[in-house]
């Protein structure tokens, strides 16, 4: 979902990493939904991508479920 929203705004991964103040590597992990960002980065991500409350909830649920699944293995 993050990648799709970024692409709709025609932002590159490099541009997003600059806007969020994080490394490109960190942003790529967020973009690929491999990592849940820190709270401050998540706030900036919400602002930059204009995420709705519904999208935020969906993203956090998905990432939390992904995290729990990988801890089970």
Feature map (PLM): residue ranges:
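Key DNA-contact positions within bacterial/archaeal DNA-binding proteins
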Residues: 14, 25-28, 54
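Short, charged recognition helix plus adjacent turn
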Residues: 36, 40, 53-73
């Amino acid at each position: 979902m993050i990648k799709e929203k970024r692409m709709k705004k025609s932002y590159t991964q490099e541009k997003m990493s600059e806007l969020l103040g994080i490394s490109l590597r960190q942003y790529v992990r967020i973009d690929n939904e491999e990592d849940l960002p820190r709270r401050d980065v998540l706030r900036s991500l919400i602002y930059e991508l204009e995420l709705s409350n519904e999208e935020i909830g969906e993203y956090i649920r998905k990432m939390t479920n992904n995290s729990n699944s990988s801890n089970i293995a």
